[in-house]
A protein has these predicted regions:
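N-terminal transmembrane alpha-helices
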Residues: 16-48, 52-53, 66-85, 109-117, ...
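Residue-level hotspots within pore-lining transmembrane alpha-helices
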Residues: 34, 38, 42, 71-75, ...
Length: 482
């Protein structure tokens, strides 16, 4: 984050160099990427330890955990509005507005936990309505009945704090506490599942309890850091949550949640289509998707950093710097994914070998198919990185509703139909479905990038900052508005 000088002085000094933008964006994104990888590691830990109880426990616990993370991830999208609002305020040298955003965002997190809690409470009847086996539905319902108590902690610790901390220059605190959470989660999972370390033996429900306790621990630790460290205390001084501000945060954030949902359902539907092709294609799909998901954490973090940095310079009233911050972030995201894609093309079998025994003849078909999907993933990753960073840049401009529509069109108007036709009419199978994903992501990436180019250029030409649902410069809010 830049030194706190007046917006007028910043404008007079001129925008930072492109290399300065690159360094600042990388410094902000690096701890966010590691924190997100730590969150993935928690899920891997849960899966491994549930697997020690057998396939039934793994199936119930895995499905219950997936339901939990899908629900809270969608609602966390609403809280991304906190990040850009704080960034705008700090850019405008209006740190006195930050506590109001903090307390209002905290209250919004608690309110959002209510529908999540209710939905998870009805996991069993929901699964029965989808004709899942009664025993599985019952076990998943019991798992979610425990895990639902972690929804407020997850929305505060992962949702609210992941948005707030980078915007005040405290991303490293999120990093270290997230890494600590991995070890706490592993300790509690093993202890509560198997009754070790003097903890009660709860079986597969112990994993749900461990996750709920861990996310609450992370939330409490992050809140404590903000309130106890003198460096951050002025950002969280007591302020009354304001209903109009909560409405603004919700209005800015709900399209992001819908965008997350549109993308998630595309991948879910693609997985279901692959499942129709047989077990080997589905296994290959899961391997390729897992590899792509790990690499995706980096551009996702760069997109979050772009959200903050673009928003900061919009608040400061320096449109050239806001535009440069966005395009430098796009270059970083695409550049990383090109390097990652090169690895996938160069050593696909070695990567597949991390998941399957290459020498086992029974795995030959799956190995070959997974290696071919990694070739598609090399292209898929580049446009995936571009679209997620582009989305972050637009959030920095408080532009979320048009990107939501662009995502819906790209994913379901282009991606799914293309994949379906290639897979089942041109008989390309799983590879065709993956080319459909790539086509959908490419269309979204192009639309996001072009929109950022147009709005940021207009900001430079008019000097009027964009606002929510920006469609005309004359109707946008004055620069510096939060």
């Amino acid at each position: 984050m830049q030194p706190q000088v007046t917006p007028a002085a910043r404008a007079h000094q001129g925008p930072p160099s492109l290399s300065r933008h690159a360094v600042d964006t990388a410094r902000l994104a690096a701890p966010l990427a590691i924190a997100q990888l730590a969150q993935m590691a928690m899920g891997v830990t849960d899966t491994i330890l549930l697997g020690s109880l057998g396939p039934d426990a793994l199936a119930a616990g895995g499905l219950g955990a997936n339901l939990f993370f899908v629900v809270v991830t969608l609602l966390q999208g609403v809280l991304t509005s906190v990040s850009v609002s704080v960034a705008h305020a700090r850019g405008a040298n209006a740190d006195d507005r930050v506590p109001g955003i903090y307390w209002t965002g905290l209250m919004l997190s608690v309110l959002l936990a209510v529908p999540a809690f209710v939905l998870l409470s009805y996991a069993e009847p929901i699964l029965l309505a989808f004709h899942e086996p009664a025993t599985l539905a019952k076990n998943v319902g019991e798992y979610c009945a425990v895990l639902r108590w972690g929804t407020p902690g997850s929305l505060i610790g992962v949702g609210m704090m992941r948005a707030f901390l980078p915007a005040i220059g405290a991303a490293r605190r999120l990093l270290w506490i997230s890494i600590g959470g991995v070890f706490v989660n592993g300790f509690l999972n093993y202890g509560l599942i198997h009754g070790a370390y003097g903890l009660p033996r709860e079986g597969f429900l112990g994993s749900a309890a461990a996750t709920a306790i861990t996310v609450w621990g992370i939330a409490i630790a992050l809140v404590a850091v903000l309130h106890l460290r003198p460096r951050y205390r002025h950002f969280v001084v007591r302020a009354r949550p304001r209903l109009p501000l909560m409405g603004e945060l919700f209005g800015l954030g709900w399209p992001v949640a819908i965008t997350y949902g549109v993308e998630s359902t595309l991948f879910l539907a693609t997985g279901m289509m692959v499942g129709l092709l047989g077990e080997a294609p589905l296994a290959a799909h899961q391997i390729a998707l897992n590899v792509a998901s790990v690499a995706f954490m980096v551009p996702l973090a760069i997109g979050q950093a772009a959200n903050v940095r673009v928003g900061y310079w919009v608040g400061a009233g320096v449109p050239v710097a806001a535009r440069h911050a966005g395009f430098v972030a796009l270059a970083l995201g695409v550049g990383f994914m090109m390097c990652s894609g090169l690895v996938l093309i160069t050593v696909p079998r070695a990567i597949v070998g991390l998941y399957l025994h290459l020498d086992d003849p029974a795995n030959a078909h799956t190995v070959a198919l997974a290696a071919s999907l990694l070739g598609v993933a090399a292209v898929f990753q580049i446009v995936d990185g571009m679209q997620t960073v582009g989305s972050g840049c637009l959030r920095g401009l408080k532009d979320t509703r048009i990107p939501m529509l662009a995502a819906a069109f790209g994913y379901w108007g282009v991606g799914f139909p293309t994949g379906y036709v290639l897979a089942f009419h041109f008989e390309l199978g799983a590879k065709g479905l993956w080319w459909g994903l790539a086509a959908g992501l490419a269309s979204v990436a192009a639309l996001m990038t072009l929109r950022f180019h147009r709005i940021s250029r207009r900001f430079i030409e008019t000097g009027i900052a964009p606002g929510p649902d920006d469609t005309d410069a004359a109707s946008a809010a004055p620069h510096g508005h939060v």
